[in-house]
Structures are given as C-alpha cells and as structure tokens.
C-alpha cells in the first residue's frame, strides 16, 4: 500500500513538473518575442505555489547597472490564468472584451494575466520604469493575446478592454505617462493611428 502511495505521489509530481516546464517554455517564447532577446518565464510549481503570497503579478530583477535579468518570475495565479487562457477565451462570456464594461472575474483575470506577461516582457527588454513598461505593455498586449490563441480582432479587443476598463484601476506607479498616447513619445508605432495596438 505504501509503495502504491509513493508511486502515485511520484507520478503526480512528475506530471506537475512536466506541465510547469511546458507552460514556462510556451510563455518564454512569447516573452522573448516581446523583449527582443532570448528570455525565460518562471512559473512556480506546486510546492512554491503553496507559499506564493501574490501581489504584483510578476517581477524582473535589474542589476546595479540597470541591466535586466534573463528571467521573469510570475505569480501562481497569473500562471494559472495564462495556462487557462485558451479555455477561457473560448467561453461565450469572453465576448465581453469587445465592450467597455467589466467582465466576469474569470475573464478579467485572463485579461490581466495577458497584460502581466506583456508588462514583465517590457522589463526584460530593459524598461525599468513601471509607468513606461505599462505603456509599452498596453501596446503589445494584443500580440501576446494572439500568441496565446486569440484571433487578431479579439486580441485587439483584449488590449482595448484593458485600457478602458482595467488600466484606470491600476496603482499609481503604473499610471500611464503623458507620452503614452497615439503619436506620443512612448508610441511604439508612431506611423500607425491604431492605438494602442499599432
């Protein structure tokens, strides 16, 4: 009986490790594209997830010279919502992203998780300022949503929804700076009039 229990635990731990590595690999590809260099995304596994207190969504460390690390560490809840993004976006309730009113908690968490991956990718790109990273993240969140399975129109709607509904609720450090407008100093694609997705 004990041997069966040990085997069952080993299989479950192995399966969880495989899922975690698969998600990390998938998200690392997306983050690398946004960051413009090879980077890694680290989602906590089961054991680390038990002690994850949450708070900021993710983090990237910078050295004393302002150089970013090669890895972002995402919170358990963000990783879960990114892992579940494909299933969430297929639900009828996801169509609410095409509007400007709050969606269900599940959809809002999915939209936020996509934004967090986009935001942390900006830090991996070398952007230290939270406000500037947020501005750039809003402009690349549609690309992230597409890489996670959204068709282009839906991906643009995710970006527009976050900007209209969720961004005003963000902490002050993440408030969009003055240059974060179409044609502004932080516009990643100033030739395009399509804001925020370029």
Predicted regions and their residues:
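Active-site scaffold of zinc-dependent metalloenzymes
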Residues: 59-113, 121-124
